[in-house]
A protein has these predicted regions:
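Bacterial N-terminal signal peptides
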Residues: 16-29
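Conserved active-site regions of diverse hydrolases
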Residues: 3, 33-296
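N-terminal secretory signal peptides that target proteins for export/translocation
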Residues: 1-13
Length: 296
């Protein structure tokens, strides 16, 4: 796990987003995920490549930065249990990650996401894939990044010589533009891309702990970053699909029962990921019933 400050990661949400992405990738073309222009033939990927932060990352031994599942004995880690959203998508096609293999054959999912990553790190992650062989037109790529940027900007607002609110919002917008620029560059390299906007940081356990004013600013910063992603990515559903993670988090927080959630404000993990497992949850917490895994 990165020593850098990190935002709370979604618990139940990671699978809900995965379901949304699965619907996108199984439907008749990426156009069903959002974005104009229809596609006649369904897109069937030969590889999955994931970019982003801890929401999409693994440790070398397959641990996730969320609630980690255990085998039937209740003690042995099982990286396939409680899959993060990128695993849900990979599972549709029978793909596995090197960090969490499926079978003994070639693992056709590649995780480039890194814990603690910011918008500026996305270009580095993409370049790592370019150096390893690049992209092909049957590659499905996922991008979800920006939550750590929002926390960084919020921490700037608390400094003695804090930038103005307008300056912070503009900085968030620029992070969104930077992310969108890399998404469009991925398309130029031949990949099909699904972009997930980041959850509303103001609704996370850490965000709520900042008080009403702090949470409101975090929500505004989140909206500024996500908004620039949405208006700057290529608006062509043949190449780019969009999943609204921010709207999901807002709906889940407002009406948790709609997603079979019993808690949408507290962190499920009693210890910080990636050490968190289904055996180390807070009192009353469940991996599927609580929206947020972590609050650090």
């Amino acid at each position: 796990m990165s020593l850098l400050p990190r935002l709370a990661t979604l618990s139940a949400a990671r699978r809900a987003v995965g379901v949304a992405l699965t619907t996108c990738t199984l439907a008749w073309g990426l156009a069903s995920c959002g974005g104009g222009t229809s596609q006649v033939e369904a897109f069937v990927p030969l590889r999955l490549i994931t970019f982003g932060d801890e929401m999409s990352a693994f440790t070398a031994d397959g641990k996730k930065y969320a609630v980690n599942g255990l085998a039937a004995d209740g003690t042995t880690p099982d990286c396939k249990a409680l899959p993060i959203w990128t695993q849900v998508v990979a599972n549709v096609y029978g793909f596995g990650f090197a960090e969490c293999p499926v079978g003994t054959g070639e693992q056709k999912a590649i995780a480039r996401a890194k814990p603690g990553a910011r918008a500026t790190d996305l270009k580095t992650q993409v370049q790592a894939q370019v150096s390893a062989g690049g992209f092909a037109d049957k590659d499905l790529v996922t991008v979800m990044i920006g939550t750590n940027d929002i926390r960084d900007l919020y921490e700037q607002s608390r400094a003695a010589s804090a930038p103005s609110k307008d300056a912070l919002l503009e900085a968030a917008r620029q992070r969104g533009v930077e992310i969108a620029t890399q998404v469009n560059a991925l398309v130029d390299r031949g990949a099909k891309v699904i972009v997930v906007t980041i959850p509303d940081v103001g609704l996370s356990p850490w965000g709520l702990a900042q008080g009403a004013t702090g949470a409101s600013l975090l929500t505004e910063l989140t909206a500024a970053l996500n908004g620039r992603i949405r208006v700057n990515i290529l608006n062509d559903g043949r190449f780019v699909g969009l999943v609204l993670g921010d709207e999901f988090s807002q709906t889940a927080a407002r009406v948790p029962v709609a997603y079979s959630l019993t808690n949408a404000t507290a962190a499920a993990c009693a210890v910080a990921p990636p050490a968190c497992t289904s055996a180390t949850l807070a009192s009353g917490a469940t991996a599927d019933g609580w929206l947020w895994a972590d609050s650090t």
